[in-house]
A protein has these predicted regions:
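Enriched for short, Lys/Arg-rich terminal
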Residues: 2, 11-25, 59-65, 69-90
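Aromatic/basic micro-patches that form nucleic-acid/chromatin recognition or nuclease catalytic surfaces
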Residues: 7
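A short, compositionally biased N-terminal segment around positions ~18-40 that is enriched
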Residues: 18-39
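Short alpha-helical linear motifs
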Residues: 29, 50-53, 68-71
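A short, surface-exposed loop/turn module that caps and links secondary-structure elements
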Residues: 32-58
């Protein structure tokens, strides 16, 4: 799976890289794992429901999530990153 990032996610990742290198390293590892196997158990990949039922989510840490949409069967566009509440907010 190829991971792509929306302008919003790119901006947020830049902030994280500047402020929290440890979290940035975790994100890099989780994205690499996602590209290798999007359904790896440690990612806790799941489809969202309700108004965001076209989106999927992976766990970066216990509190940080990244949400994505599938552009096709091999390309995921990450459109949100943040805490559980930030990502799942309507």
């Amino acid at each position: 799976m190829t991971a792509k990032f929306s302008p919003f996610v790119q901006k947020e990742l830049k902030k994280i890289y500047q402020k929290d290198r440890k979290l940035a390293n975790i994100i890099e590892k989780q994205i690499a794992l996602f590209e290798e196997n999007p359904k790896h158990p440690s990612l806790r990949t799941h489809k969202l429901s309700g108004k965001v039922s076209n989106m999927w989510s992976i766990s970066i840490t216990m509190n940080i999530r990244m949400a994505y949409i599938l552009l096709d069967e091999n390309i995921a566009l990450f459109i949100k990153i943040g805490t559980h509440d930030e990502v799942y907010r309507k």
